[in-house]
Regions:
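Short alpha-helical elements
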Residues: 1-257
Length: 257
């Protein structure tokens, strides 16, 4: 119970941040709602912390075990409708929390960049998928050698010794968007990394962007060398293996998600 109260108080505190406040429903009919936006966000995040993955399971959990704390819990339809309206507020809250975590962490000057496919449907079903077409589209995943309908999650993160990396910037794009283009846009929008080394895979090899990062951000972009046909240089294999090892924490982060 104490942790639930702590979560509620934390969201109350963060809701005063202008980035979150302007995205919450203070100017809507929910301003006078008996079940506040802070309560709604608390209920959803509390359910997610219990390992529940769907809105339905979270709603049923709150209704079954925490109706005493959330006495004005609305209907399931209203719960989902208001969650949709608060999507931007959740994103702003994540941004604030990431900033706080980065500020309290020892700077390592080591960063990692990667993307992760979020597959809504795969295989033969992907050709006829209609889910969230304004966000999703069809593309092929070369790693898994399959076609899928979905989105792609792009992450810049700060490396930490023996811990999961802390995201510096996160963006969702359509699945077909090139990783390099997405990374360039994120860098242009918010310059998430500075003064260090950025480890990435071959998808991000680009001489112009490498020069830009070095000149404008003081960041060295470190990628495996593109192997040429009949290339058997063992030393380059060792470098690629080392870079892959340094990038491994981001894979752990994606698996954790």
């Amino acid at each position: 119970m104490n942790k639930l109260i702590e979560l509620y108080c934390a969201i109350c505190h963060h809701s005063e941040d202008s980035r979150i406040a302007e995205k919450m429903q203070h100017g809507s009919n929910n301003k006078s709602a008996q079940f506040t936006d802070v309560e709604l966000m608390t209920a959803y995040l509390w359910g997610a912390q219990q390992g529940l993955l769907t809105r339905k399971s979270i709603y049923n959990f709150i209704r079954t075990y925490h109706l005493g704390e959330f006495q004005k819990l609305p209907s399931y339809q209203a719960f989902c409708r208001r969650l949709n309206r608060l999507a931007a507020a959740f994103a702003a809250l994540a941004e604030v929390l990431f900033e706080q975590k980065l500020a309290s962490s020892e700077p390592t000057h080591g960063y990692v960049l990667d993307s992760c496919p979020v597959m809504v449907s795969v295989g033969s079903r992907s050709n006829t998928a209609k889910t969230a077409r304004d966000l999703c589209n069809l593309t092929r995943n070369p790693t898994k050698n399959l076609w899928y309908h979905g989105v792609k999650l792009h992450v810049f993160a700060q490396l930490r010794p023996r811990k999961l990396p802390i995201p510096c910037a996160v963006q969702i794009s359509k699945a077909s968007l090139c990783d390099l283009w997405a990374a360039k846009q994120i860098d242009l929008d918010c310059a998430p990394v500075a003064d260090g080394r950025l480890y990435a895979d071959r998808a991000y090899i680009d001489a112009e962007w490498r020069s830009h990062l070095q000149t404008e951000r003081n960041v060295a972009l470190i990628t495996p060398r593109k192997r040429k046909k009949y290339d058997v240089l063992v030393s380059e294999d060792a470098v690629s293996t080392r870079i892959s090892a340094l990038r491994q924490p981001i894979e752990g982060f994606f698996n954790w998600l």
